């Protein structure tokens, strides 16, 4: 055959192949919309969740069945289908997205199982923008990228939705300074989700800049704490930045953290943590003018608190920048997102390696950092969005209360005599067999010459209410002629609720732990007693969040076994009431037995 004919037929074949590819692509894309994307056909991982990592099968739609080419990786085809499902522009700037039709049904069904709309997540691009929610003053900051310490970002995952994990990775790559971001270390804590195996390896190998992402796979599930230690051991950056596997960063969130550690290597830093809705993926904030810092509750749980006025005054005195963007001291940290000098992390004791699973490690590190000479600071110009779920979709090994057991270990080492208040709130942990030996952590405290928990409360968190100090009485508020006690009925203390009545427990329980303060406030740990404004009975006792200044909390008096509300002059009364009824006040009657109460201590 003459050369010109060979050339002609060659071009014709290429033209036909291109035309076929275009027709196939058009069929896949037709009828697509942000509300109801086309179902990706053809090659799929078998179930793609909960099966062996290497099992694949052919998938066919009503019209086509396409065999897997022998020369092409099956993961490439699957990843291409994943990318086809994504809708460019969907959810950009962090706006909410609402699915409809079959996609909504799929999303709702998945949400019931894992508390996250994975159907929607798969339609959002991995590198979507979430907007710039920083204080405008932050944009004026300048950092010398050549002199910033380098960062190793450590992300632990266990059966994290594939698309959510990759969005965390891509967000980190696109929002952190390229020179400063040395590496991202993904630690697989024993996942059995097929997508997180060889498919993830292939994606990282083919679509992430070489050397930027390392995947460390643990043979057995170790839990968050030990998995983080495994990641930290192989990190090579100057700074460790720990992130949860479901985060998206704001513009320039890394640099302020690295700059502050450059200035103060014993400062442990947390960004402002914004909320990404687990259902519609909306990125929301409380604005840039105010933010909260970390506190704790006496039952060992982390708590958010408003920035104390005392801290605002310290910022004005000590900070050279505008106060709104100054580092703010935080008594504790949530623990999911923070930055720490890598060498200091090991010097100050890293994590308690005998803690299992998850929970308690954040307060342990918080108290340890403060008591041993460091600081915990919130950096206002660093903002990261985090998906908060309604429930935890994964069980912990052996269904143990790892949070409670870990917190008890923490309390034994760091809380000194205040451990008694912890056990008042968690009596079930006082003699728990699984707490284990804490000798090596006590030795660490001695080695580091750390301060007392009394010092911590006095100097770092003086706003924290101590139920047994500066009080006229504390414990159960017990009716004299009945086995009935004042009780919070386990209600949500983040908003006002009606106090109630309940049979007195043999052992003091958290729900019946009240204090009558020296400033005449009747309260529990977080809420103060008031009386509902009403034109007629019943006059209910309402618990409202306490004000930092006791002058603004309503006053009560305790006289001759009567608990009297100062504003109304009425007395706490259980006449005609039974268990689970709302607590009430009534006009005082010195002869009424139902108005007589004792305070336990």
From Swiss-Prot:
Domain (Ricin B-type lectin): residue spans on this chain: 472-600
EC category: transferase
Disulfide bond recorded as keyword: yes
CDD domains: beta-trefoil_Ricin_Pgant1-like, pp-GalNAc-T
Annotated GO biological process: protein O-linked glycosylation
Catalytic subdomain A, as annotated region: 148-260
SMART domains hit by this protein: RICIN
EC number(s) recorded for this UniProt protein: 2.4.1.41
Segments on the Cytoplasmic face: 1-7
Lumenal membrane side: 29-601
Alphabetical UniProt keywords: Disulfide bond, Glycoprotein, Glycosyltransferase, Golgi apparatus, Lectin, Manganese, Membrane, Metal-binding, Signal-anchor, Transferase, Transmembrane, Transmembrane helix
Tissue expr: Expressed in developing oocytes and egg chambers. No expression observed during embryonic stages 9-11. During embryonic stages 12-13, specific expression is observed in the developing tracheal branches and brain. During embryonic stages 14-17, expression is restricted to the dorsal longitudinal trachea. In third instar larvae imaginal wing disk, expressed in clusters of cells in the presumptive pleura and notum.
Gene3D superfamilies cross-referenced by the UniProt entry: 2.80.10.50, Spore Coat Polysaccharide Biosynthesis Protein SpsA, Chain A (3.90.550.10)
Record keyword Glycoprotein present: yes
Cofactor: Mn(2+)
Domain of life of the source: Eukaryota
Function: Catalyzes the initial reaction in O-linked oligosaccharide biosynthesis, the transfer of an N-acetyl-D-galactosamine residue to a serine or threonine residue on the protein receptor. It can both act as a peptide transferase that transfers GalNAc onto unmodified peptide substrates, and as a glycopeptide transferase that requires the prior addition of a GalNAc on a peptide before adding additional GalNAc moieties. Prefers the monoglycosylated Muc5AC-3 as substrate.
Membership in a protein family: Belongs to the glycosyltransferase 2 family. GalNAc-T subfamily.
Name of protein: Polypeptide N-acetylgalactosaminyltransferase 1
Organism: Drosophila melanogaster
């Amino acid at each position: 055959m003459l050369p010109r004919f060979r050339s002609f037929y060659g071009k014709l074949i290429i033209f036909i192949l291109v035309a076929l590819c275009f027709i196939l692509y058009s069929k896949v894309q037709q009828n697509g919309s942000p509300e109801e994307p086309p179902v990706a056909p053809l090659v799929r991982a078998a179930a793609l969740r909960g099966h062996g990592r290497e099992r694949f099968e052919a998938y066919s739609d009503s019209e086509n069945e396409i065999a897997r080419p022998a020369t092409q990786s099956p993961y490439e085809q699957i990843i291409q289908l994943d990318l086809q499902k994504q809708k460019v522009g969907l959810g950009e700037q962090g706006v909410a997205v609402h699915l409809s039709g079959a996609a909504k049904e799929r999303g709702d069904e998945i949400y019931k199982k894992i508390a996250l709309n994975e159907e929607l997540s798969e339609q959002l691009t991995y590198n979507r923008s979430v907007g710039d929610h920083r204080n405008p003053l932050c944009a004026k900051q300048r950092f010398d990228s050549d002199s910033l310490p380098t960062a190793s970002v450590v992300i632990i995952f266990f059966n994290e939705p594939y698309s959510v994990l990759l969005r965390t990775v891509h967000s980190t790559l696109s929002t952190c300074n390229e020179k400063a971001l040395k590496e991202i270390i993904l630690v697989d804590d024993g996942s059995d989700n097929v997508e997180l195996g060889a498919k993830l390896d292939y994606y990282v190998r083919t679509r992430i800049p070489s050397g930027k992402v390392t995947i460390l796979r643990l043979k057995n599930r170790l839990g968050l704490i030990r998995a983080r230690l495994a990641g930290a051991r192989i990190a090579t950056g100057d700074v460790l930045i720990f992130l949860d596997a479901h985060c998206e960063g704001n513009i320039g969130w890394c640099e302020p953290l690295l700059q502050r550690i450059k200035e103060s290597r014993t400062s442990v830093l947390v960004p402002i943590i914004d909320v990404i809705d687990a259902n519609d993926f909306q990125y929301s904030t409380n604005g840039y003018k105010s933010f909260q810092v970390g506190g704790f509750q006496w039952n060992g749980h982390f708590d958010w608190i408003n920035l104390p006025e005392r801290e605002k005054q310290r910022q004005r005195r000590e900070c050279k920048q505008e106060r709104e963007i100054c580092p703010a001291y935080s008594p504790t940290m949530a623990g999911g997102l923070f930055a720490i000098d890598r060498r200091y992390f090991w010097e100050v004791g890293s994590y308690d390696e005998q803690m299992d699973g998850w929970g308690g490690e954040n307060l342990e590190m918080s108290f340890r950092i403060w008591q041993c000479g460091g600081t915990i600071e919130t950096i206002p110009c660093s903002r990261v969005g985090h998906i908060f779920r309604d429930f935890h979709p994964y069980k912990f090994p052996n269904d143990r209360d790892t949070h409670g057991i870990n917190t008890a270990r923490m309390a034994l080492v760091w809380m000194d005599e205040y451990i008694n208040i912890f056990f008042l709130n968690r009596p079930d942990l006082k003699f728990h067999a699984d707490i284990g030996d804490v000798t090596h952590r006590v030795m660490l405290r001695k080695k580091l010459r750390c301060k007392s928990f009394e010092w911590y409360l006095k100097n770092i968190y003086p706003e924290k209410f101590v139920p047994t100090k500066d009080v006229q009485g504390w414990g159960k508020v017990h009716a004299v002629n009945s086995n009935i006690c004042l009780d919070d009925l386990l209600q949500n203390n983040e908003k006002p609720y009606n106090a109630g009545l309940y049979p007195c427990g043999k052992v003091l329980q958290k729900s019946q732990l009240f204090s009558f303060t020296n400033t005449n406030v009747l309260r529990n740990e977080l809420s103060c007693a008031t009386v509902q404004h009403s034109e007629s009975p019943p006059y209910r006792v309402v618990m409202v969040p306490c004000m930092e200044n006791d002058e603004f909390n309503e006053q009560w008096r305790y006289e001759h076994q009567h608990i009297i509300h100062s504003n109304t002059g009425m007395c706490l009364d259980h006449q005609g009431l039974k268990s689970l009824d709302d607590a009430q006040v009534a006009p005082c009657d010195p002869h009424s037995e139902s108005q007589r109460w004792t305070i336990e201590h």
